[in-house]
Amino acid sequence: MAATALSMSILRAPPPCFSSPLRLRVAVAKPLAAPMRRQLLRAQATYNVKLITPEGEVELQVPDDVYILDFAEEEGIDLPFSCRAGSCSSCAGKVVSGSVDQSDQSFLNDNQVADGWVLTCAAYPTSDVVIETHKEDDLL
């Protein structure tokens, strides 16, 4: 009965105004919820990324907004890394086919990128891609 009385009193209450604590909570909550809805509605591409490692080949479905190294680690794949910022060559690999966006890296020069070198810590897939990993010694 108390629950019914409480809900009935809420229904009979006058419409909330901006000075009402309830209205204030609603006004604050709406802007926080809106970005989450937009994020959930964002279309996201995923690409087949094949990593050719010394231990064998691994295929992953990597989202287009996640670094290849980060996703591989989440899946339990051990890849070399050091800086995680694209400013060294520890995670260097060689693109066999496909393409990546590695505009966040600062170590490789234009010729090395054109030759297919990739830093997996700063590379997003932009198509299905095959990458030979553990190639730092070949790069240097």
UniProtKB/Swiss-Prot annotation:
Pfam families, per database record: Fer2 (PF00111)
Organism domain of life: Eukaryota
Family named by the database record: Belongs to the 2Fe2S plant-type ferredoxin family.
CC cofactor: [2Fe-2S] cluster
GO terms, biological process: electron transport chain; photosynthesis; response to light stimulus
Gene Ontology cellular-component terms listed: chloroplast; chloroplast stroma
Keywords: 2Fe-2S, Chloroplast, Electron transport, Iron, Iron-sulfur, Metal-binding, Plastid, Transit peptide, Transport
Record annotation: effect of changing residue 109 to D: Increased affinity for Fd-NADP(+) oxidoreductase and increased electron-transfer activity
Stated name of the protein: Ferredoxin-2, chloroplastic
Species of provenance: Zea mays
Function: Ferredoxins are iron-sulfur proteins that transfer electrons in a wide variety of metabolic reactions. Occupies a key position both for transferring the photoreducing power to Fd-NADP(+) oxidoreductase (FNR), hence the formation of NADPH, and for mediating the cyclic electron flow around photosystem I (PSI).
Cell membrane keyword on record: no
